[in-house]
Amino acid sequence: MQVKIDTREKFHAITIQDPVLAANMTEELEQCLLPFLQKEVKNVVLILKDTSEVDDAAAESLVKIQQGFYDDSASFVICELTPGVEKSLEDSGLLELMNVTPTESEAWDIIHLEEIERELFNE
């Protein structure tokens, strides 16, 4: 699996550079994303602009990974879905379970709001 990682102040922007995210890549996906939970900056924005197909098993894995981030008080936002991937996720009923934004900028806004929310609930 090809990825590009850009580290920002409050999150890591990870771009999947493979055209297909398939079931046989779920373990590799977890191995790529879950270690970020051990870093000081835990938040992840997953950019899927180069991915034209995500099968159901890979999508279910993304939902589980996202839940793992939220269980560990970190944000996980997916952005820049291609229309085909968005339709596929919607048809499978998984899109509504995911934290998805159209752009990386909006993903940053979500992370910022979730950080404020976590601070308020921890007081």
Indicate where each model-derived feature is located.
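Structural signal for conserved beta-strand scaffold positions within catalytic alpha/beta enzyme cores
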Residues: 15, 100-102
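STAS-typified acidic loop motif
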Residues: 2-37
